[in-house]
Amino acid sequence: MKQKHFLISLAVLATGISVGAQTKDNVKTTFQTSREWKPSIDNRADAVMVYGVGGNPSDKSRKLSFEDRVKSWKERGYIIHFMTGIAWGEYQDYFTGQWDGKWHLDEGQVTQAGDTIWHGHMVPYIVPSENFLSYLKERHVKRVIDAGVDAIFMEEPEFWARAGYSESFKKEWKKYYGFDWRPQHESPENTYLSSKLKYYLYYRALNEVFTFAKEYGKSKGMDVKCYVPTHSLVNYSQWQIVSPEASLASLPCVDGYIAQVWTGTSREPNFFDGRKRERVFETAYLEYGSMESMTAPTGRKMFFLTDPIEDWPRDWADYKKNYQATFTAQLLYPNIADYEVMPWPERIYEGLYRTSANSDKKERIPRFYSTQMQVMINALNRMPLTDNKLTGSEGFSVLMANSLMFQRFPTHNGYEDPQLANFYGQALPLLKRGVPVKTVHIENLGYKEALADTKVLLMTYANMKPLESEAHSHIADWVKKGGVLIYSGTDNDPFQNVREWWNTNGHNYTTPSAHLFEQMGLPARPEQGEYSYGKGTVCIVRTDPKDYVLHEGGDKDFLYLAARMYEQNAKAGKLYSIGKDSSVMLH
């Protein structure tokens, strides 16, 4: 009976939501596969992303040529797109010298121990050199466009935080900084510099490849669209991976993203009320939210991904439960209505997985699950775009920055941020009590829409740093007009003192927050308390947000403060979710 009710609810969602603006093109649903068409993997989406000129390196089946795979799907009425990896892929001809007569396995990402980080056999994660980018453009992008494909998806621009020791990375360091490479484990400064370079290398890679794709397509009379399928900033930060993320939205050659959120990313444990555990629904909600807020002010297209299984082998009951959790989370963003309905249907429909957690017996997908899954996918095919809002006390936003990824590994001076607790410490206390907390990207504050729906902004510099000073002007202006800022932080993590704009070129601030506070007429290091600025309010709490979730009951004072600021200062209404009198004094 529960399953029946779940399916009926989906049908109501698909047909009953008021329709707002429509999507800009006719691709609403898509999926990725390295296989040719066959009935068992035909899921009736609008488009298919045919994976890899040489296929998917993890797929060991006999592969048809790229052109034959394209033809097989096109004959069945599918719109054809292309997907491949930008950091890894079926590129053995490059690594083994078939491209230019030179071996390039030394261009893999390497750890301090001297080990290459592999995605698979002969498939290293790449330090994207100019030579590799030339190879991608000539051997892959040209061939795809020549086959008539006018949409290219370059997925997962990923540089592992624990990497940064290869000769190829050292060469890129010298070119970028003008001085010799420095080991990232030796100081926070070196870690920060290393992360900024990793960030830049994949920004450059996507910019070059996509710009080439558009220019080459134009020479063929084609308007080529370019997209970045990427994990969320939440997940990359937690998994200790550096990626360009929000900065890509500023590139004119990037037309949109796929939010790669699924059970595998969302089951990463986090802390709440002193307990570390999986919280798949809550994490998925925040992951999708960070992707939505990353592109919302820019107007770029966004596909939301869900996966009925995951990369790690588990059992069908586990897959189904967590698929439903992530699927539900994506529907809580009604302003997004384009979807990648699944990756790799060949492994979903044809793979063998355990029948239960306590059994070694393996079977293909149960009929009841495949039927439910197809109903869910068909609902997405008809899901309208809407400007509907969630119920609940809206107006809380957590500030994020790409530099969240810069402070994750290695750690220094004994400062730890376990499981990204400084982020979750601001979000989970509210979310777990039914408050639909959102995220805002500091890189987007220049867009007036970025803070338009925010009543109370939650921020810290314990886990990130502002890469540009302009963000502080935008925050100060927003507060002056009536916004409420709650700043939580001791400002004593080891990255406060890295050489950056706040302590160079005429600036002499000991912390980035000192510059922010100065914009609002406060001293460089104000005491904990409540301050007025213009029509708005600044609350400073001298506690790192991780302490709100690492300890049982650690969020009590934070919740009372958030409720009081929301109700009394922001005048945003009653925060019913907290459920207690929210009068509390800051001392």
Show where each model-derived region lies:
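Aromatic-lined carbohydrate-recognition surfaces of secreted/lumenal glycan-active proteins
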Residues: 25-33, 81-85, 153-157, 192-241, ...
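A glycine-rich, often tryptophan-bearing local segment used as a flexible ligand/cofactor-contacting loop or short
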Residues: 99-100, 466-545, 550
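Catalytic domains of carbohydrate-active enzymes, especially glycoside hydrolases
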Residues: 26-68, 72, 142-152, 252-257, ...
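Glycine-rich, aromatic-flanked loop segments that form ligand/cofactor-binding clefts
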Residues: 65-119, 150-161, 213, 217-228
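Hydrophobic targeting/anchoring helices
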Residues: 41-46, 51-52, 155, 217, ...
